[in-house]
From Swiss-Prot:
It is found in: Cytoplasm; Nucleus. Its main location: cytoplasm. The keyword tRNA-binding does not apply. This is Ornithine aminotransferase car2. The modification N6-(pyridoxal phosphate)lysine is found at K275. One of its GO terms (cellular component) is cytosol. NCBIfam families: Orn_aminotrans. Its EC number is 2.6.1.13. Keywords: Aminotransferase, Cytoplasm, Nucleus, Pyridoxal phosphate, Transferase. Pathway: Amino-acid biosynthesis; L-proline biosynthesis; L-glutamate 5-semialdehyde from L-ornithine: step 1/1.
Length: 438
């Protein structure tokens, strides 16, 4: 089959599944639905079936799929210049750097492409600062993170992970990073201020940074107790440790604040952004910090061929403008409250908990009451009824629709979720089961 026919033929969902299973590594287990077209909060498969997207590419399309303003910026810039590398200046990165730093209230930015790259960049920056400013002995800097974190999948980042799926069989791991440091008598648990106090009291002079998610998304939308992040920040300041907020999934209005950390009235020393800063049309990420911290980077000490490219810069400016112009922060706060209230009030016996902030929410399924059915089965039922979501960590389903979703569509989605919850323990799963791929 020629490249032209592969690109322009219309394949069925089943054909797409076969092609992907045959030619792509099996490092994902997708829900059996294929996106062929998308607009706003809706997607369509090759057969023309319409769905409400309640995942938003893990919060990358906060502004909705194929937002016209963002697509226009992409097309216009793609026709002018797409890549210069940082070997030269381009006429979009400088304006983007000014725009994003003023937008989030920081002094300097270093641009990257993916969330994981931005996390790695922030960790390198923290180590640089630790050696050059804090005077930590060479090769002894520590970066702390929490149990059940998710910051990405690079070798450096999985050294911090406690998730067996992300970590196992990839060793050996980097020392001095993560929730368990050699010589400690405990792990550093999320939402446990005593654990952080222990680590800073024990290792403080060698700790460069504490890296934390304001809400642990992949762990099941774990919202910390009120006061936890404030106290964590104060402890970091007392020990001269950088407080780094990973806002790749939680940032850009998703939780009803521009940055999720704003719920805690904390301004981190370093903020990591990705996903929705480019509206889901081009990979862009960024690390924001003060001039004093950022200037520890010198020419040649870090870089990225694509980081700061004019195409990504133009797209990101448009994407961030959309957030403010369409008041997506306020929409997320209002619609998120309606979502949680509706699911709590339905009083489903199989729902253990509903939690979240803004339009980043999770429903915990009590699989002891579902007659052997699982959260995955529930997602298959919802898919057949036009709502797309996916489990995280087994019995937890994350719901995070685009922030542009109308209230009418949100309520339609909620009704599908409620009916599917009601039907799960007794429904015949045969029509919903995944077909084997040959």
């Amino acid at each position: 089959m020629s490249a032209e026919s592969l690109l322009h033929n219309t394949f069925s969902t089943e054909q797409i599944e076969v092609l992907e299973n045959e030619y792509a590594a099996h490092n994902y287990h997708p829900l059996p639905v294929c996106f062929s077209k998308a607009k706003g909060a809706k997607v369509w498969d090759p057969e023309g079936r319409e769905y409400l997207d309640f995942l938003s590419a893990y919060s990358a399309v906060n502004q909705g799929h194929c937002h016209p303003k963002i697509i226009e910026a992409l097309v216009e810039q793609a026709q002018r210049v797409t890549l210069s590398s940082r070997a030269f200046y381009n006429d979009k990165f400088g304006p983007f750097a000014k725009y994003i730093t003023e937008y989030f209230g920081y002094e300097m930015v270093i641009p990257m492409n993916t969330g994981a790259e931005a996390v790695e960049t922030a960790c390198k920056l923290a180590r640089l600062w630790g050696y050059k400013a804090k005077k930590i002995p060479t090769d002894e800097a520590i970066i702390l993170s929490c149990v059940d974190n998710f910051h990405g999948r690079t070798m450096g980042i999985i050294s911090m992970s406690t998730d067996p799926d992300a970590r196992d069989n990839y060793g050996p791991y980097l020392p001095n990073v993560g929730p368990k440091i050699s010589g400690a008598d405990r792990v550093l648990r999320y939402n446990n201020i005593e654990d952080l106090k222990y680590y800073l009291d024990t290792f403080g002079p060698k700790v460069a940074a504490f890296l934390v998610e304001p809400i642990q998304g992949e762990a099941g939308v774990m919202v910390p107790d009120d006061g936890y992040l404030e106290e964590a920040y104060k402890l970091c300041k007392a020990h001269n440790v950088l407080f780094i907020a990973d806002e790749v999934q939680t940032g850009v209005a998703r939780t009803g604040k521009m940055l999720c950390i704003e719920h805690s009235n904390v301004k981190p020393d370093v903020v990591i952004l990705g996903k929705a800063i480019s509206g889901g049309v081009y990979p862009v990420s960024a690390v924001l910090s003060s001039r004093e911290i950022m200037l520890n980077f010198e020419p040649g000490t870090h870089g990225s061929t694509y980081g700061g490219n004019p195409l990504g810069a133009a797209v990101s400016i448009a994407a961030l403008e959309v957030v403010k112009e369409e008041k997506l922060t306020e929409r997320a706060a209002v619609l998120g409250e309606k979502f949680r209230t509706a699911l709590i009030e339905c009083k489903s016996p199989i729902v253990q908990k509903v939690r979240g902030r803004g339009l980043l929410n999770a429903v915990v399924i009590d699989e002891s009451k579902t007659n052997g059915r699982t959260a995955w089965d529930l997602c298959l039922i919802m898919r057949s009824r036009g709502v797309l979501a996916k489990p995280t960590h087994g019995n937890i389903i994350r719901f995070s629709p685009p922030l542009v979703i109308t209230e009418e569509d949100l309520m339609k989605g909620i009704e599908v979720i409620k009916k599917s919850l009601n039907d799960l323990p007794t429904i015949d799963m045969t029509p919903y089961a995944e077909k084997p791929i040959h």
